[in-house]
């Protein structure tokens, strides 16, 4: 009978070395074989090339964690250990670095709220860099008392949370750039991109090429999964969820493994267009307009995101090119475009039963240009609209006032909100960065040249949007003059 290599682990058979592993809490002795350790990693090759260790039969090694260190060496003997507990995963990462093994930072660790204090203490001992700060930002719950942190730490954490990139979509390429146009990442494809979206609160982009949907992690620089799907017309995301729509249904996909686990079927027999709004945990699906009783109407359907059932559907009197949901006053904005004109209407409803009011209120009319984009900004209770001819304006729902912010004197192809007051506008050869808190020429704070082949512009979101908003409000309340900033440089981040 043949024996596997694993039978020699911690066995005295042919063992020529005993190592006592020691950390701050425990110690353990294990029998090893120098030739196996020598082949396993550079740490032991360096050790055994020294005279004293090469002739020793017992040595002591102080390691970051005893259990993780032993499990790492078990792998040299063909023994694999699986443990996804956050502390074990981080200890394994630290120990692999200690032994000189190639390893990637475990960026996808999830820490339960009861472990947050222990987790923060662990990171404090481990050290701060971009990876650990992102991990903290990802896992701190919104309810955590941030005022227990020094101000310099809160500011550093906010810089990590507030880092966003523009996503420029070409025919065969997706490029991530900062607001100055500096390229952060470029992803090239063999086939043309049919649709793309950023999965909110993550470092992932979902895109469709021919009959395959893929999710790409731009921080880890790898494909998370790919899924064959020949019928998809639209993909979109909200609150970390991924949705795809075809001719008759909406499908929710797990953005981690690609598994489908929820469907919203439509009785509407034409191509559906999908929008997702998660404030009240429902999605809205609307189809291509058609003639209904001699009038153009569009079917609007509400689906419960938790239960999966239809809440309500109704016919909107008109053609819908875009819509935005507004949780304030429970209303929706519908955009109707014609050949060279565009109109924005507001329709109100009761959220509890999705009871639609019959009135349709005009809030803005573009007499000389189509409306390319409408964006709801919750922090300002306002709707931003961008017209094809370069006009950018806003409608405030609280005052019922519409005003023009600026005219970029360039054709607008697409637009996206980067932060609560910063708007990125895509023109044929330029990206304009606009401050919507300002008007006229003062609103244009930056612009950079891009290829005319760009068809879509998107923005990455914070890895923890709710925490970012909470820290932003907290920083606004901090009196800088009353706080000592002498420790501002204690935390340094590495690129």
From Swiss-Prot:
Residues 15-85 form the BTB domain. Signal peptide: none annotated. Belongs to the mimivirus BTB/WD family. This is Putative BTB/POZ domain-containing protein L98. It comes from Acanthamoeba polyphaga mimivirus (APMV).
């Amino acid at each position: 009978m043949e024996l596997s290599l694993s039978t020699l682990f911690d066995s005295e058979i042919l063992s020529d070395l005993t190592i006592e592993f020691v950390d701050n809490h425990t110690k353990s002795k294990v029998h090893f074989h120098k030739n196996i350790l020598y082949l396993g990693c550079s740490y032991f090759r360096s050790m055994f090339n020294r005279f004293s260790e090469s002739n020793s039969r017992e040595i002591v090694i102080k390691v970051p964690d005893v259990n993780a260190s032993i499990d790492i060496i078990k792998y040299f003997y063909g023994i694999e250990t699986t443990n996804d507990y956050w502390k074990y995963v981080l200890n394994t990462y630290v120990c692999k670095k200690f032994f000189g093994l190639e390893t990637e930072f475990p960026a996808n660790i999830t820490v339960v709220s009861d472990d947050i204090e222990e987790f923060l203490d662990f990171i404090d001992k481990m050290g701060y860099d971009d990876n650990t700060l992102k991990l903290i930002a990802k896992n701190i719950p919104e309810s955590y008392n941030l005022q227990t942190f020094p101000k310099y730490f809160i500011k550093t954490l906010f810089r990590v949370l507030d880092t966003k990139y523009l996503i420029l979509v070409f025919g065969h390429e997706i490029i991530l750039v900062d607001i100055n146009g500096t390229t952060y990442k470029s992803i090239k494809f063999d086939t043309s991109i049919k649709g793309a979206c950023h999965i909110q609160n993550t470092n992932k982009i979902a895109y469709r090429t021919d009959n395959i949907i893929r999710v790409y992690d731009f921080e880890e620089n790898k494909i998370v999964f790919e899924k064959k799907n020949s019928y998809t017309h639209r993909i979109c995301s909200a609150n970390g969820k991924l949705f795809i729509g075809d001719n008759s249904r909406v499908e929710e996909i797990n953005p981690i493994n690609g598994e489908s686990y929820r469907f919203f079927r439509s009785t509407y027999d034409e191509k559906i267009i999908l929008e997702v709004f998660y404030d009240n945990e429902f999605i809205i699906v609307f189809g291509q307009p058609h003639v209904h009783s001699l009038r153009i109407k569009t079917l609007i359907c509400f689906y419960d995101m938790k239960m999966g059932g239809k809440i309500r559907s109704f016919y909107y009197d008109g053609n819908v090119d875009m819509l935005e949901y507004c949780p304030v006053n429970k209303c929706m904005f519908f955009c109707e475009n014609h050949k060279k004109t565009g109109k924005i209407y507001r329709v109100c409803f009761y959220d509890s039963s999705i009871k639609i009011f019959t009135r349709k209120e005009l809030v803005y009319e573009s007499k000389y240009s189509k409306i390319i984009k409408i964006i709801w900004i919750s922090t300002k209770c306002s709707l931003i609209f961008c017209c094809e001819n370069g006009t950018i304006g806003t409608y405030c729902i609280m005052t019922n006032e519409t005003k023009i912010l600026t005219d970029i004197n360039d054709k607008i192809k697409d637009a996206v909100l980067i932060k609560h007051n910063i708007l990125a506008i895509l023109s044929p050869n330029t990206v304009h960065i606009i401050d919507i808190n300002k008007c006229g020429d003062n609103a244009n704070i930056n612009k950079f040249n891009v290829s005319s082949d760009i068809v879509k512009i998107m923005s990455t979101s914070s890895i923890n949007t709710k925490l970012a908003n909470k820290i932003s409000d907290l920083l606004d309340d901090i009196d800088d003059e009353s706080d000592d900033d002498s420790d501002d440089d204690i935390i340094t981040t590495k690129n």
